[in-house]
Amino acid sequence: AICAAERLSALNSEIEIHPYAARLTKDNAYDIIQEYDIVVDGCDNFATRYLINDICIAQKKPYVYGAICGFEGQVSVFNYGNQKKNYRDLYPDEEEMQRMPPPPKGVMGVTPAIVGSIEATEVLKIICGFGDVLAGELWTIDLRTLQSNKFSL
């Protein structure tokens, strides 16, 4: 986090960065998330996603979710506006998700770039109040076939 903050500051000295050199846990997540209006997820595990989801619900904050696995990605916006669908609606059985085997090693470099760009677009739509936010919907992409879909939750 600190190295990333230093590199970003070198690119743009006008931005304000608050790096957290600690893992997000039940002990610190509530206070960290409380400082922000929108939460954007870039984590790589189910436990952290459930934690972020539950705190965003408690604090009534939109949660912009993105996940990748190899050549596949998905994005959604939870707990936004009148749409109260959340991560637990997408994956209701937390224990089952924790038992899943780890994904295969390696991610195609453009997969996180595409998913992150879609997440950033959703944040801009929320902030600026334009377009249809992915609230209550899940957008998926498979980069092997370039097929994308949007599903209602």
Language model features by range: what are they?
Residues 1-153:
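Adenine nucleotide-associated cytosolic modules
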